[in-house]
Amino acid sequence: MVAPKIRIKLRGFDHKALDQSASKIVDTVRRTGADVSGPVPLPTRIRRFCVLRSPFKYKDAREHFEIRTHNRLVDIMNPTKKTIDSLMTLDLPTGVDIEIKTVGGRA
């Protein structure tokens, strides 16, 4: 039987807020007695856009914009009820998207 594991994926445009929230999660989980793996930085997704500056002509005048989406991964091994309760009440900064999944283990 595989031990239960919680996988947390964090996404955001601001890498500082992302690292801050990842460290908050790791500190909270360690205080409850569960084992933590991470935060692991995943590849950054870069979306680039090329836009004409002029509304009509001057095709050579263009502007380039990009959006960088940073990702982090945190795995929690052998979580307890106290761990899950503390994660539910955790206050994280805005602009960070959190995806929580349970992996492995059967009841």
UniProtKB/Swiss-Prot annotation:
It comes from the Bacteria. The keyword Calcium does not apply. SMART domains: Ribosomal_S10 (SM01403). The keyword Ribonucleoprotein applies. InterPro entries: Ribosomal_uS10, Ribosomal_uS10_CS, Ribosomal_uS10_dom, Ribosomal_uS10_dom_sf. One of its GO terms (cellular component) is ribosome. Transmembrane segments: none annotated. It holds the Pfam family Ribosomal_S10. Keywords: Ribonucleoprotein, Ribosomal protein. HAMAP family: Ribosomal_uS10. Involved in the binding of tRNA to the ribosomes. Part of the 30S ribosomal subunit. This is Small ribosomal subunit protein uS10. It comes from Deinococcus deserti (strain DSM 17065 / CIP 109153 / LMG 22923 / VCD115).
